Amino acid sequence: MPRKGPAPKRPVIIDPVYGSPLVTSLINKVLLNGKRSTAERIVYGAMEGLREKTGNDPVITLKRALENIKPTLEVKSRRVGGATYQVPIEVKPGRANTLALRWLVGYSRARREKTMTERLLNELLDASNGLGAAVKKREDTHKMAESNKAFAHYRW
């Protein structure tokens, strides 16, 4: 165990185009092999598509999509006397954001559209309307936590 304590949180750089740290985080999640300009082109293309399709600020639509994806509960494995229990725990806000972005990008990559920009755009639109694979993942996570509620007293 390290004795220095937790590593300090680094500030998220605010995105120059939309002025939102959420957009920066999304770009960082889309980023592959250090190709930041490609990731920015994908995200900015999806944001412009959101502006065209919804007719309002894409950052608002992104926030609404993330609110629909963010989990409030998850399960963690806890070993007690030879048995492993899935213990439901509440998700901290920072982790909820990270999970939402991770699921959004992961399920965008798994979609069938031709370009990543289209995939991300359509997953964002679906999520903002309460549909899509990322929202289903959240529902499944909540369902797992609900079905394992009996083990909540093993929380640490």
From Swiss-Prot:
It comes from Streptomyces coelicolor (strain ATCC BAA-471 / A3(2) / M145). This is Small ribosomal subunit protein uS7. It comes from the Bacteria. One of the primary rRNA binding proteins, it binds directly to 16S rRNA where it nucleates assembly of the head domain of the 30S subunit. Is located at the subunit interface close to the decoding center, probably blocks exit of the E-site tRNA. Transmembrane segments: none annotated. NCBIfam families: rpsG_bact (TIGR01029). Belongs to the universal ribosomal protein uS7 family. InterPro entries: Ribosomal_uS7 (IPR000235), Ribosomal_uS7_bac/org-type (IPR005717), Ribosomal_uS7_CS (IPR020606), Ribosomal_uS7_dom (IPR023798), Ribosomal_uS7_dom_sf (IPR036823).
